[in-house]
């Protein structure tokens, strides 16, 4: 006869089965490091320079955050590290106290702290979403995502080309799309007005925004002629009609324009500066060399007709030229070159931004301080400062960067397991900005003979064929090579943090593979 077990005897078993459900659901990615020992955290912060730590009141309190951070960890692998400390655990309480984590308030279950370069950086107080945390870890000091602004809830935020194409295909309402870059000051100025207009026009129009600064959006930028930021395009039934170019608009201006969208009015062509007359000499590719030979002291302004800073400086430059003209040739003369027309001169003197000033003394070119006003032009021309000695070329400086040429490029990289190569031009502003970061990354791995940070000056004649073979179309360009074979283009983050994180991921991958081989043996 079967024995009947009282129901109350089964209760402890039921409770035992139910209790671990939240514990089992708190499983998290192996990419998240659980830490309880202060020494382990100290070591981690010393060896990783971009760390986000989740401190929780208990394991249960961390459940939803761990689930989210597991997906984030995968997305930022090689660029950032995520850790978890359970402050409710007896072993971890000492660590939480030492790190000044206070979770005593009833409604406070977790804290997210960010550490950079071994030190506390900031408390994470942005949106707790996948996109926001990923964006933060990829650029901890960068601006928040536009969509994090509560006022931008009526703007449609597009993340990728697939979503962009889907919007154009399926949306019946007219679309005003802002292509922008997060760092762009003009974009930041117009964004509040754009989002206010989106709210006012909700249900009638779609106002959307898309960060197209990353290189993955080159096709979109080419298709819609995105030459600067912001570029605002108007669509009807998925078809691009024209651009909206009033970047100083208010929300009311945008709303009013959308009532009757019209293409930009053709601008009345400006009179070329050279045709206006005045005391500034306007030089060309043909007469430049002869002019600087005939005049012992010449200050030349390289400009572009569309350049706002040039237009602002032009009257100051012209007024100074009039004063100097009255003094005869004793104080020198001021001259100008339209770099958009006289391209040979612009290339010869590596003109990469406008306006650029060059000073010529008896035909020789010298460096010029930052002159912008009538007074500074006159004072400097009356008594030109002795030109400071030029900074040594990058390849002449003592660094850990390997400066290669077309002759030794292949042979050198064949001996390196991991090589990150920077193709650059010495005059390029973006290259100048990246060089100290790349140099610091090279120094960080100088003791590892399998790793190299190398550089190629694409301006040098004997390197031009190599740069062309490696499909270098812009400066700087970064390529990763494995024993001399091209693997991928690096275009994520041209900073010391970005470079070192990328290389460290490659090295950690080597260690993982070595560990697996040892286990197999």
UniProtKB/Swiss-Prot annotation:
A GO cellular component annotation in the UniProt record: endoplasmic reticulum
Signal sequence range: 1-25
Stored Pfam families: Thioredoxin
Disulfide bonds: 184-187, 307-310, 428-431
Residue ranges annotated as motif Prevents secretion from ER: 518-521
Record bears the keyword Endoplasmic reticulum: yes
Enzyme Commission code: 5.3.4.1
GO MF term (any one): protein disulfide isomerase activity
Thioredoxin domain: residues covered: 136-263, 274-386, 387-508
Source organism superkingdom: Eukaryota
Places the protein is found: Endoplasmic reticulum lumen
Keywords, sorted A to Z: Disulfide bond, Endoplasmic reticulum, Isomerase, Redox-active center, Repeat, Signal
Reaction(s) catalysed by this chain's protein: Catalyzes the rearrangement of -S-S- bonds in proteins
GO terms for biological process, alphabetical: protein folding
PROSITE patterns (UniProt xref): ER_TARGET (PS00014), THIOREDOXIN_1 (PS00194), THIOREDOXIN_2 (PS51352)
Enzyme class at the top of the EC tree: isomerase
Keyword Transcription regulation part of the UniProt annotation: no
Family the entry assigns: Belongs to the protein disulfide isomerase family.
Name used for this protein in its record: Protein disulfide-isomerase A5
Species assigned in the record: Bos taurus
Gene name for this UniProt entry: PDIA5
């Amino acid at each position: 006869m079967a024995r009947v077990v009282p129901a109350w005897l089964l209760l402890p078993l039921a409770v035992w089965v139910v209790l671990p459900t939240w514990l089992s659901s708190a499983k998290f990615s192996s990419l998240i490091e659980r830490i309880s020992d202060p020494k382990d955290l100290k070591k981690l912060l010393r060896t990783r320079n971009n760390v986000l730590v989740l401190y929780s009141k208990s394991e249960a309190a961390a459940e939803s955050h761990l689930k989210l951070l597991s997906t984030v960890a995968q997305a930022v692998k090689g660029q950032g590290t995520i850790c978890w400390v359970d402050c409710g655990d007896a072993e971890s309480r000492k660590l939480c106290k030492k790190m000044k984590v206070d979770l005593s308030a009833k409604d406070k279950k977790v804290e997210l702290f960010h550490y950079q370069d071994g030190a506390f950086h900031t408390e994470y107080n942005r949106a707790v979403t996948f996109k926001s945390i990923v964006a933060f870890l990829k650029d901890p000091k960068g601006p928040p995502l536009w969509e994090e602004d509560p006022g931008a809830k009526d703007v449609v935020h597009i993340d990728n080309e697939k979503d962009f194409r889907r919007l154009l295909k399926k949306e019946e309402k007219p679309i005003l799309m802002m292509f922008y870059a997060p760092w762009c000051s003009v974009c930041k100025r117009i964004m509040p007005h754009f989002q206010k207009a989106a709210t006012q026009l909700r249900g009638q129009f779609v106002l959307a925004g898309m960060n197209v600064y990353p290189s993955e959006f080159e096709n979109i930028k080419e298709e819609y002629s995105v030459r600067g930021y912001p570029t605002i395009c108007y669509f009807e039934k998925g078809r691009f009609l024209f651009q909206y170019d009033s970047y100083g608009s208010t929300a009311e201006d945008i709303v009013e324009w959308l009532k009757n969208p019209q293409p930009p009015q053709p601008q009345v062509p400006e009179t070329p500066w050279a045709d206006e007359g005045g005391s500034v000499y306007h030089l060309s590719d043909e007469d430049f060399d002869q002019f600087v030979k005939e005049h012992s002291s010449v200050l030349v302004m390289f400009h572009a007709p569309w350049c706002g800073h040039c237009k602002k400086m032009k009257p100051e430059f012209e007024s100074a030229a009039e004063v100097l003209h009255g003094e005869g040739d004793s104080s020198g003369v001021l001259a100008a070159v339209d770099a958009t027309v006289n391209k040979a001169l612009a290339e010869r003197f590596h003109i990469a931004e406008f306006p650029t000033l060059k000073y010529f003394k008896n035909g020789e070119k010298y460096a010029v301080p930052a002159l912008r006003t009538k007074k500074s032009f006159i004072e400097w021309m009356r008594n030109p400062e002795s030109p400071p000695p030029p900074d040594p070329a990058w390849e002449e400086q003592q660094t850990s960067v390997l400066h290669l040429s077309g002759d030794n490029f292949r042979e050198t990289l064949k001996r390196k397991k991991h090589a990150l190569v920077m193709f650059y031009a010495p005059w390029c502003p973006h290259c100048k900005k990246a060089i100290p970061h790349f140099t610091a990354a090279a120094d960080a791995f100088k003791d590892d003979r399998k790793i190299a940070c190398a550089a190629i000056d694409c301006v040098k004649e004997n390197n031009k064929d190599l740069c062309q073979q490696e499909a270098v179309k812009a400066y700087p360009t970064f390529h990763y090579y494995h024993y001399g074979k091209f693997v991928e283009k690096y275009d994520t983050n041209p900073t010391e943090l970005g470079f070192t994180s990328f290389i460290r991921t490659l090295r950690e991958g080597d260690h993982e593979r070595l560990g697996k081989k040892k286990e197999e043996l």
